């Protein structure tokens, strides 16, 4: 069966209207109705509330409060390695960026330039670099943290479609992650620039960052950009940088010769915030080779 057949209904659905409606429902403070919705969601998706800082579902005034719940202290210890996984989820793909193309799924790649909103100069910094795409399912923790230390330089809001971003849709919708609404966060790290892209989806009510709040509140169809290079906004490895109000996908971009993903990082593997994601290239270069370079 064609990979496109299962996703054909998504082309017909009024995705924006559904997303706006879902956002209103998720933000409503409806007492017992809200608690009932939360209880149903936990049962439907198998959410582990023992990991939550506040496991009492009756204390959440809205579904959004529940969905963006904090984890209890110690639930996600951070690995000592230079790069950690920034979210709970499952690896969609990871690998090398080749000729401005990022692998999406069998038969599909998309443009790095398109992903970052058409900025050729920004995209060029990641030629032959590394990428990782992590999908956050409904059951997952939906706050996004820093994979390494970084100084925020820019943020770009790119309007777009609102297709689902689950694995079935990734196999069936071309250019999915460069097609959907997204927020591009550009950082400067110890090894150079890196990017975290928060990709929206059907019924993702909003995307927030810790320094700005809700980024896509208006959805007026225009690319918007913020510059932070004149101020110092530094975030530490493991520090929260954003969150999804109803889940989605994070795409990470790193420059050439910056890092090497751990061998265990393969497509469809479940991952958790704080686990080791990658080593710096210098850290894994054999001593003899290091001597030759110097």
Swiss-Prot record:
Residues with PTM Pyruvic acid (Ser): 248
E.C. designation(s): 4.1.1.65
GO cellular component, one term: plasma membrane
UniProt enzyme class: lyase
Pfam families: PS_Dcarbxylase (PF02666)
A GO molecular-function descriptor: phosphatidylserine decarboxylase activity
Annotated family: Belongs to the phosphatidylserine decarboxylase family. PSD-B subfamily. Prokaryotic type I sub-subfamily.
Function, in words: Catalyzes the formation of phosphatidylethanolamine (PtdEtn) from phosphatidylserine (PtdSer).
Name of the featured protein: Phosphatidylserine decarboxylase proenzyme
Source organism per UniProt: Herminiimonas arsenicoxydans
Lineage summary: Bacteria, Pseudomonadati, Pseudomonadota, Betaproteobacteria, Burkholderiales
Gene behind the chain: psd
């Amino acid at each position: 069966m064609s990979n496109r057949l299962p996703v054909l209904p998504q082309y017909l659905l009024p995705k924006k209207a559904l997303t706006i409606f879902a956002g209103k429902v998720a933000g409503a403070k409806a007492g017992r109705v809200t608690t009932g919705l939360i209880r149903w969601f936990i049962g439907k998706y198998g959410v582990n509330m023992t990991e939550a800082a506040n496991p009492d579902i009756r204390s959440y005034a809205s579904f959004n409060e529940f969905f963006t719940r904090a984890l209890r202290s110690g639930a996600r210890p951070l690995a000592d390695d230079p790069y950690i996984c920034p979210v709970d989820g499952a690896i969609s793909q990871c690998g090398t960026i080749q000729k401005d193309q990022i692998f999406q799924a069998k038969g599909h790649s998309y443009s790095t330039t398109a992903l970052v909103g058409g900025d050729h100069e920004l995209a060029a910094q990641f030629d032959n670099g590394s990428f990782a795409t992590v999908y956050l399912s409904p059951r997952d923790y939906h706050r996004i943290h820093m994979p390494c230390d970084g100084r925020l330089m820019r943020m770009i809001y790119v309007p777009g479609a609102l297709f689902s971003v689950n694995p079935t849709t990734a196999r069936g919708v071309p250019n999915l992650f460069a097609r959907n609404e997204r927020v591009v966060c550009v950082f400067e790290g110890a090894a150079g620039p890196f990017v975290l892209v928060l990709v929206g989806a059907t019924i993702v009510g909003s995307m927030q960052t810790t320094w700005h709040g809700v980024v896509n509140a208006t959805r007026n169809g225009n690319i918007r950009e913020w510059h932070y290079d004149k101020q110092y906004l530094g975030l530490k490895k493991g520090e929260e940088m954003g969150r999804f109000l109803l889940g989605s996908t994070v795409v990470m971009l790193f420059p050439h010769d910056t890092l090497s993903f751990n061998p265990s990082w393969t497509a469809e593997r479940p991952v958790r915030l704080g686990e080791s994601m990658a080593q710096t290239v210098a850290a894994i270069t054999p001593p003899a080779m290091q001597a030759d370079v110097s």
